[in-house]
């Protein structure tokens, strides 16, 4: 049997659910302490970020080298994305990334934040701490909502 802590970690590592689902499950289904629920959810949510940030670029480069179709697609995607959002995003990109990851709604979070960092060319050394900070803030928000300390 897998421990509840490891189950919480795994749930938090999954896309879409992330810690937004892991914390309430850990608190109410597994009856973990607030501290355990928070720590295992945050760590589980941050864990895949490392691989996403490190390997998306390698995969896109590999595919671009192997296929003209992929090269055209990635060139189009990066050029379009960066040109379309360059003005406002460049000035506030660090703040944007933290806020985007910290908003506890579906389609925002560590997975999507990592994808955004990749698309905008934010290097790992900069993106990882920003996304981690956003995950910690999201963890605090979701924990407080789960405990009824913030009403939604």
Show where each model-derived region lies:
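Interfacial loop-to-transmembrane junctions
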Residues: 117-137
């Amino acid at each position: 049997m897998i421990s509840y802590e490891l189950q919480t970690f795994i749930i938090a590592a999954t896309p879409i659910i992330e810690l937004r689902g892991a914390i309430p499950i850990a608190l109410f289904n597994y009856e973990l302490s607030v501290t355990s629920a928070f720590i295992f959810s945050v760590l589980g949510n941050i864990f895949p970020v490392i691989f996403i940030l490190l390997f998306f670029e390698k995969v896109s480069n590999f595919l671009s080298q192997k296929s003209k179709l992929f090269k055209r697609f990635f060139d189009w995607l990066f050029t379009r994305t960066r040109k379309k959002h360059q003005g406002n995003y460049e000035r506030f990109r660090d703040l944007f990334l933290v806020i985007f990851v910290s908003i506890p709604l579906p389609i925002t979070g560590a997975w999507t934040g990592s994808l955004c960092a990749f698309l905008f060319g934010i290097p790992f050394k900069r993106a990882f701490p920003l996304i981690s900070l956003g995950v910690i803030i999201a963890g605090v928000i979701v924990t407080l909502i789960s405990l009824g300390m913030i009403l939604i």
